[in-house]
Amino acid sequence: MPPPLPSLCNFNLAILFLFLTPTFQIPLIAPISKDDTTQLYTLSVFLKTPLQPTKLHLHLGSSLSWVLCDSTYTSSSSHHIPCNTPLCNSFPSNACSNNSSLCALFPENPVTRNTLLDTALIDSLALPTYDASSSLVLISDFIFSCATAHLLQGLAANALGLASLGRSNYSLPAQISTSLTSPRSFTLCLPASSANTGAAIFASTASSFLFSSKIDLTYTQLIVNPVADTVVTDNPQPSDEYFINLTSIKINGKPLYINSSILTVDQTGFGGTKISTAEPYTVLETSIYRLFVQRFVNESSAFNLTVTEAVEPFGVCYPAGDLTETRVGPAVPTVDLVMHSEDVFWRIFGGNSMVRVAKGGVDVWCLGFVDGGTRGRTPIVIGGHQLEDNLMQFDLDSNRFGFTSTLLLQDAKCSNLKVNNFANGIK
């Protein structure tokens, strides 16, 4: 297990950069924090020259990252991209109008769905290696979009932009891969509370070294949605989000009878299942949600559980005193997300299916799945709470998604990934 990362003051006194070669294989690490108010996640990186710690909203989508570029943005290494250059023309959506000579982009907030027009920028970004040296590795030509403070609405209060972890060639993982000639793959481990940090691991397909005990991943194919769900639609592109081939849902081993046609992404981009950190809880289309809740409540009777008054946004809650605590959370029916084969499933235990609500004299455990209505594009959106303390790998070279069930089964947590010094230094 690598030691905790050195403090920022040590980085400022003497920053050691690796001399990169085409065979560079040391993974890079970035801490992930959870925000109590929004229930969203931020990824910490070093940005600018001199390097400055910066927190960005973690998003499993978007074609490019974006950063607040107000009057306080100063960097000796930043430079704009001219219009009508091969680089500018390669972006999925750009604008070179209003007599501007600078390439402009349309950064988007995935939570509020706000967007705006702002200039593209190139600057330095750095992340530490996940080894004994914790050396900073410099990406000197990191491409992103500028944005104004308006676009930060709805994100964590300390977020200064968005880190795109989507399928795009200009996402953060893709630019790291291109710069270091490393595998186009990254691993996520989201923390379950704001008291701890998780981590993102870049430039490596390995995961066995992350924890003291061996943790195996189960894999399923990533599905390409042919139509992106973006605000700006003048140049339609495939989605940068991650869709998986979910074929059924089981509760306590019993399948729900879902209309299978809506579980497949069609040519207009509707249907299917995606993984999202823009949603705090898993969102189910109304017909699926009703089946899900009915079956869960029925199966809960075997645990001697009786529903009580629900707390928004949840539809089913139980008195906290009625649930038995286990090492994987409250004892409730298991939820299995079944993939391309019956023996390939993502099992969700109580720690990820239930949410504790204790406030105003109320103390309940609520089912952490919400009704998404009937008009959504994607009938199943797996949200952040269901992902916490699970190890996930997004391997674009092999077009596959690797996952575990809760790490608590292995007496492990995402906070074991020892990046607390980095995170504490930039809060």
Swiss-Prot record:
According to the UniProt record, what class of enzyme is this?
A: hydrolase
What Gene3D superfamilies does the record point to? Acid Proteases (2.40.70.10)
Q: What does this protein do?
A: Involved in plant defense against Phytophtora sojae. Contributes positively to soybean resistance against P.sojae. Binds the P.sojae xyloglucanase XEG1 and inhibits its cell wall degrading enzyme activity and its contribution as P.sojae virulence factor. XEG1 acts as an important virulence factor during P.sojae infection but also acts as a pathogen-associated molecular pattern (PAMP) in soybean and solanaceous species, where it can trigger defense responses including cell death.
The UniProt entry's sequence similarity note says: Belongs to the peptidase A1 family.
Supply the InterPro entries for this chain: Aspartic_peptidase_A1, PEPTIDASE_A1, Peptidase_aspartic_dom_sf, TAXi_C, TAXi_N
Residues modified by carbohydrate are: 99, 169, 245, 259, 298, 304
Name this protein carries in UniProt = Probable aspartic proteinase GIP1
* One cellular component term from this protein's GO annotations in UniProt: apoplast
Which GO terms label this protein's molecular function in UniProt?
aspartic-type endopeptidase activity
Q: Where is the signal peptide?
A: 1-25
